Amino acid sequence: MRFVFVHGGFHAAWCWEHTIAALEGLGHEGVAVDLPGHGARVDEESTLANRRDAIVSAIEPGDVLVGHSGGGFDATLAADAAADLVGHISYVAAALPREGRTYPEAMAMRDSEEGEFDADVGEMLGYLKFDDDGAMWFADFDGAWKYFYHDCDEATARWAFERLGPERFGDTTMTPVSVPAFWAADLPRSFIRCLQDQSMPQWLADTVTRRLGVEQLTIDTSHSPFLSRPRELAELLVHATTTTPTGPLVPD
């Protein structure tokens, strides 16, 4: 199998290196995408369309598409644009759009039985800095270690922190998203929750799982299993492709 990896906020393709190496050891292939505004494409404009197109250009027929954190949002847009190419889509502690809603709305909404909006972002904001041009940075190593990498050794956490880049949102926080082809395609799909996650609250992971109509898979890691347990993550991703949905997709 061939896996296409989409990183989350502040990260870039580099974060998947160890997981791809582990997959290759299992007899599979993997490629990671730098989204515009990140990694080798840090100077490119970050828009919903640019990010979607960067992923679509990497997908080959039958690929497994993997989105982490906010990258789940981008991966879904790519799957909407190229549903005929995607063999499976896996969400690793990742976001899922809500039809007709913006990204911040999708991230803040609980299931209806739990109430509408929950905009609490916790203490993490205290570790962020904002440039005059609107770029957002994770400015503090201790904060990154706490929220992203707490189960990594310090050397690994520092290696990752030194590679974090700015997050430039462009239109990604303001534009309502519609992905009708994704909902209609009913693609094979899975969700992996990180049991020690300090970035994605359990209620949000549970909400995304229910909206995907899948049984939740788990890995006992921080928000960044690609660094702390890449071999275990690789094995779980391979297993995820053998699972099938247990219910329908819920667009909103």
Name these PLM-found stretches.
Residues D80, D84-V86, S90-D132, D171-T175, ...:
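Flexible "cap/lid" loop of the alpha/beta hydrolase fold
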Residues V66-G71, A75:
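Gly/Ala-rich beta-loop-alpha elbow adjacent to hydrolase catalytic centers
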Residues E162-L212, Q216-R231, E235:
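Conserved serine/cysteine hydrolase catalytic core
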Residues R2-A40:
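Conserved HGGG/HGGXW glycine-rich cap/lid loop of the alpha/beta-hydrolase fold
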